[in-house]
């Protein structure tokens, strides 16, 4: 007799409280988490920072380190803790490949675990991975803002326009009001 096992793990009730909405943007400190991989994400966060500030928020940009050893990872963790300790809202991206999606979601969940309203940003191609990673940490209800894939390799002016076109949806995904 042959037994066939499902490769899917058993479902566990890990769901944590829902991600809180932002509410009014005016007066909030919105943290935009960048990495060192995607120039297109720098352009997007530049555009979103301008739009957030026009809506009355203050923006703080933090660049995640590239982990090359224990020292960099420890220092990066300390810097991130300081970053999320000084913001009211976290926007973590960009999930655009396997490892960058892992770290963007890791940092989003870290912010959410402190009670911050949080949005993870992934490209459409990496949505499923991002949601799976968040669910593994008990956040199957993480707010995820989807962006088109691919972004990298497009002309700068096109990427900046995409950012502007997606800003209203970012605000809606945050549960924010302008």
Q: How would you label these PLM feature ranges?
A:
Residues 126-138:
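Glycine-rich, charge-decorated loop segments at or immediately adjacent to ligand/cofactor-binding or catalytic sites
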Residues 22-23, 27-59:
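Glycine-rich phosphate/diphosphate-binding loop of Rossmann-like nucleotide-binding domains
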Residues 52-66, 141-148:
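Short beta-strand elements in bilobed, periplasmic/extracellular small-molecule ligand-binding domains
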Residues 145-178:
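A charged, well-structured terminal subsegment
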Residues 10-17, 71-84:
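Glycine-rich, highly charged phosphate/nucleotide-binding loops
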């Amino acid at each position: 007799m042959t037994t066939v096992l499902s490769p899917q793990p058993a479902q566990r009730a890990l769901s944590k409280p829902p991600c809180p909405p932002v509410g009014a943007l005016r007066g909030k400190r919105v943290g935009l988490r960048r990495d060192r991989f995607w120039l297109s994400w720098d352009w997007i966060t530049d555009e979103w920072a301008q739009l957030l500030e026009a809506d009355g928020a203050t923006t703080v940009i933090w660049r995640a380190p590239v982990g090359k050893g224990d020292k960099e990872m420890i220092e990066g963790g300390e810097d991130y803790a300081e970053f999320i300790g000084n913001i009211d809202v976290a926007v973590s991206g960009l999930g655009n490949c396997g490892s960058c999606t892992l770290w963007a979601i890791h940092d989003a969940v870290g912010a959410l675990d402190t009670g911050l309203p949080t949005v993870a940003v992934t490209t459409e191609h990496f949505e499923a991975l991002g949601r799976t990673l968040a669910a593994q940490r008990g956040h199957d209800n993480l707010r995820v803002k989807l962006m088109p894939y691919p972004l990298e390799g497009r002309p700068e002016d096109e990427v900046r326009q995409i950012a502007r076109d997606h800003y209203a949806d970012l605000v809606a995904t945050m549960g924010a009001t302008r």
